[in-house]
Amino acid sequence: MTVLGVTALTISTYCGYLYASYRREVTKAQSLDVPQDVSDRYNRTAPNFDAEVEMSEKVMRMGKKRQDLVRKARGDVLEVSCGTGRNLEYYDLGERRGHDEDGRAVIRGCRSVTFVDLSPQMIEVARNKFGKLHPDFKKVTFRAQDAKDVVPPSAGAKPTYYDTIVQTMGLCSMPDPVGTLRHLGSITEPHKGQILLLEHGRSYYDWLNKILDNLAPAHADRHGCWWNRDIGEIVRQSGLEIVEEKRWHFGTTWKYVLRPVSGSQDAKQ
């Protein structure tokens, strides 16, 4: 047998093995009865979460994408689904005045930051990490809480809002992602406030979506994440205004800059 023949046989055998393994995993995944709310899985995975995702995030250059997104945060900031705090190192902490490219006065940096996650175990990891990264920044709060229940701190009779809301890789684990986004829009400053999202979900390509769909129950059961959600449709149904949208990795990684629709309407009046 020629070298070419041996190579072809080896490749075909390996591909056959991969396909057989994939079919077994699909059969196993489809047999699972997994609820839509799988957020409790993070209580179990919290201690090892960073180690489990570190390599894949490096390969996908997610650190740079997180940094580019989080550096936009300013004013009073809320991060929901903060997990173990994989965004902590990217925050520009400490509010100060500056100017944009057109010379207009702007506020830069974060006056305060509130971190929220449904998992107490995840919050504890994030709290410890923040203390090591930013020991001198005191205007920070950590809460184990559902994002749909978050309200800004009271300021008497005057309505209060967050200037920036950040969420990365959170819509995949929420039982009601549309309702959560709508709530976040209601507590975002209506004129200049912003909601910053970095999410993963469905692809541009049907063949990849089929793989995601077939393996989704097993992935959700193990990792607490429905990786086949249509992020674009969730955002559309939320009613928030899309300021910026980008996608990478065959369309499975989604970035959004959003704002409340009422803010853009008021600004025009």
Describe the role of every protein-language-model region.
Residues S56, L196-K255:
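C-terminal alpha-helical "lid/dimerization" subdomain adjacent to the S-adenosyl-L-methionine
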Residues T10, V116, L198:
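The conserved SAM/SAH-binding core of class I Rossmann-like methyltransferase domains
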Residues M1-D33, D37, H183-S186, S238-E241, ...:
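Terminal single-pass membrane anchor helices
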Residues V178-Q194:
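A short glycine-rich, Lys/Arg-flanked "PGG" loop and its adjoining helix->strand segment in the class I
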Residues K148-I165:
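A short acidic, Gly/Pro-enriched loop at the edge of an enzyme's catalytic core
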Residues T160-P177:
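A short SAM/SAH-binding and catalytic strip from SAM-dependent methyltransferases
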Residues K72-P153:
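Class I SAM-dependent methyltransferase SAM/SAH-binding core
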